[in-house]
Amino acid sequence: MKLKIAVWVLLLSFSTLLFAQQKKTYTYATKDGQELQLDVYAPDFSSKSEKLPTLVWMHGGGFSGGVRDNQSETKLCETATKQGFVAVSISYRLLRKGTSTYFGCDCPAAEKKETFKQAAIDYMDAVSFLIDHSDDLHIDTDKIIAGGSSAGAEAILSAVYMPEYYLDGAYDQISFAGVFSLAGALVNLDEITSKTAVPTVLFHGIADNLVPYSKAAHHYCNPKDAGYLVLNGSDKIVDRLSLLGTSYLFYSYEKGRHEISGIPFGDLTDVFDFFKSTIVKDTHITKTISR
């Protein structure tokens, strides 16, 4: 019996070690003396040359908090690998951390836009690093999905849909195959064009009190507030995608507030199935799920 227990413990430890070896951490940039890192989670590969669709995830936290390797982000990435994806979770500069206004109605609108821009730049630098090392990391550079929650969603939506507005064409060599946004919004809806529109999954609560579900001021600031900045939320993004004939999967929560920015683990199978269908099989899907 003791021998069986010892063997079982050894096998369990070995399997845990094997799984842990699938996560690797890299520094993709150093800015303002801060090393910006990313974690790459990968499934077992059938061959050294195999490349897979890749989710590149940006955590939330109001641009003042959050970490790339918290429990939820880690679980998301592990789930993605089980679905046959490479998953990456990135750190980025938290430019509102320690400021007196943070990211609310006292934060000037110009600073909010600059925060979106710098976060988008960090995101694109991370993706550039991944593309440069795509052979070693088994990344299919034609099937990169940009994903993020709350502040992270705002950043990735800016990076994917508004590259000319925020990035001045500096990353034109990068293209995305999909978007996965949790309670995100963007400044200019017209920047979503036939060139930038890609299959998109969005989750948003109609009663979101921070990031507007439709078109409204960020944090619902008053017009006289320094931080008054009108954003277009998921509902408006879906309208634009529909107009352009682009695939989308939209989860709309009637009474949902900003907690909908949490990772929807119960729906991840459907989310990844959507990307497999639209990105891999080129199937056209337009679906709204109301809850």
Protein language model annotation of sequence segments:
Residues M1-Q22:
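Bacterial Sec-dependent N-terminal signal peptides
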Residues A20-E50:
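N-terminal cap/lid segment of alpha/beta-hydrolase-fold proteins
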Residues S46-L52, W57-S100, N188-L189, N209-P212:
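Short substrate-entry loop that stabilizes the transition state in hydrolases
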Residues Q83, V127-T196:
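Primarily recognizes the serine-hydrolase "nucleophile elbow" in alpha/beta-hydrolase
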Residues S91, G147-S149, F180-A183, F203-H204, ...:
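Alpha/beta-hydrolase-fold catalytic nucleophile elbow
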Residues C107-D135:
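Alpha/beta-hydrolase active-site loop
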Residues G169-L244:
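The feature captures the conserved acid-bearing segment of alpha/beta-hydrolase catalytic domains
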Residues D235-R291:
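C-terminal catalytic histidine-bearing segment of alpha/beta-hydrolase fold enzymes
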